[in-house]
């Protein structure tokens, strides 16, 4: 409380704070700036009144009624609660009066009941806001036309991320980029091996085609293997001792330089008859 003292000689007033405890002074000062509607001081004197304001996670705003004073009671505490917890505050404030003055802690609803599951929200969003909760990703994909590319995996390595899908043994776009390249290489290698095997098997047919150009080769027996092929340029079969027909042409065909007919004793290398293969 503030007392006014008058000094007759000076002619002015002096306001001196009455001596009291620090707690009373703090409560009086706070009550001056934040008056309550019922005229009481801010720190409640009873347990019931303190329980009514013991809420540090909500904001309470009480509008002034016509019967009360013109100033309203506003609690400017930091709001850390949810709208559901704010709605539960009047129930928690009225609980002490119903229990004969005993303070009852405020019971807030559980988090699972107050909030919505993010998975359910996401599924309902991707399902096109259908109004009914989604029961699973499979039903969501079936109902909203889920893209099959999101569930596609490589048939070889099982990866789901690749810059390009390639054709494979299980159908189009069944392999990832790396596995598709390896599969193509193996396929080409197998095709080349098959072609080589077919050429080796047809060696007897090639020999028969060559034999058509020589009369002596027609009389020779047909040979089916490459190792026993009879040369069509040897007269009398390939048994040895036969006369070689067209030896110059045979040497040119085999890329071999024929030796000179008459070699001298002083020559180390065989002499060429001319610069050309044909004499």
From Swiss-Prot:
Description of the deletion phenotype: Reduced plant size. Delayed transition from vegetative to reproductive growth. Reduced panicle size with overgrown bracts at their bases.
Stretches for region Disordered: 52-94
Disulfide bonds, paired cysteine numbers: none
GO MF, any single term: sequence-specific DNA binding
Tissue spec: Highly expressed in inflorescences. Expressed in vascular bundles of root stele within the elongation zones, of elongating upper internodes and of the junctions of leaf blades and sheaths.
Superkingdom of origin: Eukaryota
Pfam families membership: GATA (PF00320)
Keywords: DNA-binding, Flowering, Metal-binding, Transcription, Transcription regulation, Zinc, Zinc-finger
GATA-type zinc-finger residues: 154-179
GO BP, sorted A to Z: floral organ development; regulation of DNA-templated transcription; regulation of timing of transition from vegetative to reproductive phase
Comp. bias regions, Low complexity: 58-74
InterPro entries: Znf_GATA (IPR000679), Znf_NHR/GATA (IPR013088)
Primary role: Probable transcription factor that regulates organogenesis during transition from the vegetative to the reproductive phase. Regulates the expression of CYP78A11/PLA1, HD3A and MADS1 during reproductive development in rice. May act upstream of CYP78A11/PLA1 during panicle development. Acts independently of the photoperiodic and gibberellin signaling pathways.
Membership in a protein family: Belongs to the type IV zinc-finger family. Class B subfamily.
Protein name, entry field: GATA transcription factor 15
Organism the protein comes from: Oryza sativa subsp. japonica
């Amino acid at each position: 409380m503030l007392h006014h003292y008058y000094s007759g000689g000076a002619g002015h007033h002096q306001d001196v704070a009455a001596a009291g405890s620090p707690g009373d002074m703090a409560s009086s000062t706070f009550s001056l700036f934040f008056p309550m509607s019922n005229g009481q001081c801010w720190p409640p004197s009873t347990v019931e009144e303190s329980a009514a304001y013991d809420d540090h996670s909500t904001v309470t705003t009480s509008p002034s009624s016509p019967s009360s004073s013109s100033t309203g009671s506003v609690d400017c505490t930091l709001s850390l609660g949810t709208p559901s917890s704010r709605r539960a505050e009047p129930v928690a404030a009225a609980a002490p009066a119903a229990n004969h003055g005993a303070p009852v802690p405020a019971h807030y609803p559980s988090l699972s009941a107050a909030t919505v599951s993010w998975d359910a929200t996401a599924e309902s969003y991707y399902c096109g806001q259908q109004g009914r909760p989604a029961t699973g990703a499979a039903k969501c994909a079936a109902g909203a036309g889920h893209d099959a590319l999101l569930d596609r995996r490589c048939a070889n390595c099982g990866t789901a991320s690749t810059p390009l899908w390639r054709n494979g043994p299980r159908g189009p776009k069944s392999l990832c980029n790396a596995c598709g390249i390896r599969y193509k290489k193996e396929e080409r290698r197998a095709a080349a091996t098959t072609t080589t095997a077919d050429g080796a098997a047809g060696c007897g047919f090639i020999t028969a085609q060559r034999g058509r150009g020589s009369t002596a080769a027609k009389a020779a027996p047909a040979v089916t293997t490459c190792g026993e092929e009879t040369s069509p340029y040897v007269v009398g079969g390939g048994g040895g001792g036969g006369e070689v027909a067209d030896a110059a042409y045979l040497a040119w065909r085999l890329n071999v330089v024929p030796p000179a007919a008459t070699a001298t004793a002083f020559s180390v290398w065989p002499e060429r008859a001319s610069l050309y293969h044909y004499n």
